[in-house]
Amino acid sequence: MDVQDLKPPKPLYLERVGFRGVRRRALLETPEGPVTLDLELDVFVDLDRSKRGVHLSRNIEAVEAVVSERRARSIEGLLRSIAKELLSRHGYAEKATVRARTRYYIDLEAAGVKGREPVDVAVTVSLTRSGGERWRVAVSVKGMTVCPSAQSTIAEAEGISDPSRAPSHSQKVLLKGTVDTGKVMVRIEDLARALLQSFSAPTFTLLKKPQEARLILEAFTRPMFVEDVVREAAWRIAAIPYIPGEALLQVEAVSLESIHPHDLVAMLRSRVSEVRSLASRSV
């Protein structure tokens, strides 16, 4: 008998045992064509109180069997296949969890500017042997905000009738949206676009001078506090029609302040149904 199969000195259930930070390159056969992703994977199974340890090599074998030998059509399909393979190889496990961190590219347009922009993504799936399935999708993006308070104060002080013509300070904002659902995974593209539309303006990798001017002018017509950004993002995510109402939503923003030595943070947690209820009452 393997040492792992012996009874443990302290018979306690372990929710997760496995590897963190397994790096693999995966090829997805998407409807838009082949996509190569560099993945950082966490692969776990649970462990019954009657067993001392997990046969950990099976975790890597499960990853290799899927990444090397199969072609998934999506990142969610890839992770689901790995989780199923984990349950198949670990007959004693009741639950498998797989998390992937990677960088995605989203087609973006704002103020007449177009670009294919990077977003950071973390996708987690948990499968149970009884058929339970849980997804968590987190997307992190960057954008800019224009301070409405400074803009309003300067407009009033300088007698500027149109506040959007008044100067203000602007800052880069780091925005992260996370949705936790049952058997429906939120599409990365949908979540990313909801977030990217929640700033005074998004950021772009390449801007020529006329594009830069248009983007800044548009941002100044939409001044936002970091609190506004978080609420706007939650509103837009809740408007994605296929997300079930029971889904858990979390939005976090960090504003890298330009005129202060410290940063600002805002965060919201809610069920999607609660946000939708407020949205319907405000129409």
UniProtKB/Swiss-Prot annotation:
Cofactor annotation comment: Binds 1 Fe(2+) ion per subunit.
Cofactor dependency: Fe(2+)
Site feature: May be catalytically important: 147
GO biological process: tetrahydromethanopterin biosynthetic process
Pfam families: GCHY-1
Reaction(s) the record says it catalyses: GTP + H2O = 7,8-dihydroneopterin 2',3'-cyclic phosphate + formate + diphosphate + H(+)
Keyword Iron: yes
Protein's pathway: Cofactor biosynthesis; 5,6,7,8-tetrahydromethanopterin biosynthesis
PANTHER family xref list: GTP CYCLOHYDROLASE MPTA
Protein name: GTP cyclohydrolase MptA
